[in-house]
Amino acid sequence: MIMSSYLMDSNYIDPKFPPCEEYSQNSYIPEHSPEYYSRARDSGYQHHHQELYPPRASYQERQYNCASIPEPDTQRGHGLPHAGHLLGKGQSASCEPPPLPLSPATPSAASSACNQATPEHPNSSASAKQPVVYPWMKKIHVSTVNSSYNGAEPKRSRTAYTRQQVLELEKEFHYNRYLTRRRRIEIAHSLVLSERQIKIWFQNRRMKWKKDHRLPNTKVRSSSSTGISSGSNTSSAAGVVAAASTTNTMSASEDLSGTERGEDITRL
């Protein structure tokens, strides 16, 4: 390809012309040394070479660290003229490789940015480890504390149950008057109440049920049983004394009747 373009170049001087001796004899042209033709031939080849290979863009040599691996410059040098020859002068500049980092400080900046981004992960993990607090676990029955709070336990206000909550509690009490801990937790979760509220409601409901059915209280029953036992002991002792007194009176009356009979017999 280079030889064909060299032969077809317009600047190339065709050597087919009359001998110089004829022109020199007629004084048409001055005599030239053979170096003239070789100089013209060389200048034409250089001009073609400049057009074929555009001037290389200014490239500054950069210093690299030992850690970085330099790219082979020989391949880059051979690749640029070939691309320029195929694409032309206008597109030769776009084939340059992308600029490399100017200073080795950029990796440290990237590492610092990574270090700044890493502290966000412990916060997310800490937020994920926080326990989930459901509404029924909160102390909603505690009233607000006054400004004159002396450190004692605040006074609890009376819980106002809704109609839906009372209905569900009554239904549960109809089937079971005593709840297990698991069932109490389930009811508290479903009704958005605390376990303490469920426990107190069932205690009050059981007392009301015993009162309606006229059943003695368990605590009152124990005290009454002790009173009854003591009363029975006193009554038994009184009975023994009464029986002894009656026997004594009966024996005394029999003695009197016997003496009276003896006196009557002697009179006769």
Curated annotation (Swiss-Prot):
Q: Extract the ranges annotated as region (Disordered).
A: 70-129, 212-268
Where does this chain carry the motif Antp-type hexapeptide?
133-138
Extract one GO BP annotation from the record: embryonic skeletal system morphogenesis
Q: Where do Basic and acidic residues bias regions lie?
A: 258-268
Matching entries from InterPro entries are given as: Antp_homeobox_Deformed_sf (IPR050609), HD (IPR001356), HD_metazoa (IPR020479), Homeobox_antennapedia (IPR017995), Homeobox_Antennapedia_CS (IPR001827), Homeobox_CS (IPR017970), Homeodomain-like_sf (IPR009057)
Matching SMART domains, A to Z?
HOX
> GO cellular component terms?
nucleoplasm
The terms under GO molecular function for this entry are:
DNA-binding transcription factor activity, RNA polymerase II-specific; RNA polymerase II cis-regulatory region sequence-specific DNA binding
What exactly does this protein do?
Sequence-specific transcription factor which is part of a developmental regulatory system that provides cells with specific positional identities on the anterior-posterior axis.
Name the UniProt record assigns to this protein: Homeobox protein Hox-C4a
Species the sequence originates in: Danio rerio (Zebrafish)
